[in-house]
Amino acid sequence: MIKVLIVDDEPLARENLRIFLQEQSDIEIVGECSNAVEGIGAVHKLRPDVLFLDIQMPRISGLEMVGMLDPEHRPYIVFLTAFDEYAIKAFEEHAFDYLLKPIDEARLEKTLARLRQERSKQDVSLLPENQQALKFIPCTGHSRIYLLQMKDVAFVSSRMSGVYVTSHEGKEGFTELTLRTLESRTPLLRCHRQYLVNLAHLQEIRLEDNGQAELILRNGLTVPVSRRYLKSLKEAIGL
């Protein structure tokens, strides 16, 4: 079965696509969302094989949403748009395909045929990594999904239970993004095997006798620095 997630702010557009896909014996619609914030959470939770994604949505567009997904768990992306002018941009965002609204069933059939062919070649549907810088980090916590702006991130830590983002206010949220992805797509600096830090919130570095160090942030929280990353940290702040 091919697991499909639909993200579109237009109820009628979602319904029309759902009706057609439900007629396909090898398609399972695992969820529908009306905006990108819900969509990000659904991708993380439901792990769809294919994401049918509207480009024009309020607050966060479909193109912006793709840039917030972890490339290690990104499904095939089929963009939906009423304007052909978005086609080139869609493929720059590693789209598998794009469909113009209103969706033509014959055109959709061709897309599904290509998807089936790709699925027969491999079991895991991962797309190439998009190196566009992240403006937000999608987080979950306190029974909600929210987008934390980069300027508000104090540090990120990796634990046995996952990756956690701590804000400058000291609030913590879980993210599906890996430390490796965050390091490559944000200004956060690696200071430890399990930590990334936002130097904009750095107040003090305390050096220790064993060659390690500890960062004191403006909010009073501390972040460890290992010997391996101490030199690059000093260089980053001009020492």
Curated annotation (Swiss-Prot):
InterPro entries from the entry? Answer: CheY-like_superfamily (IPR011006), LytR-like (IPR046947), LytTR_DNA-bd_dom (IPR007492), Sig_transdc_resp-reg_receiver (IPR001789)
Q: Which organism is it from?
A: Shigella flexneri
Q: Which domain of life is it from?
A: Bacteria
Residues annotated as domain HTH LytTR-type: 137-239
- Function comment: Member of the two-component regulatory system BtsS/BtsR. BtsR regulates expression of btsT by binding to its promoter region.
The protein's GO terms of the molecular function aspect are: DNA binding; phosphorelay response regulator activity
Please state what the protein is called: Transcriptional regulatory protein BtsR
As for PTM, the annotation reads: Phosphorylated by BtsS.
SMART domains in alphabetical order: LytTR, REC
| Keyword line | DNA-binding, Phosphoprotein, Transcription, Transcription regulation, Two-component regulatory system
**UniProt KW Transcription keyword:** yes
Question: What would be the name of the gene that encodes this protein?
Answer: btsR
Signal peptide per UniProt: none
Q: Where is the Response regulatory domain?
A: 3-116
Q: What is the lineage of its organism?
A: Bacteria, Pseudomonadati, Pseudomonadota, Gammaproteobacteria, Enterobacterales
Positions carrying 4-aspartylphosphate are D54
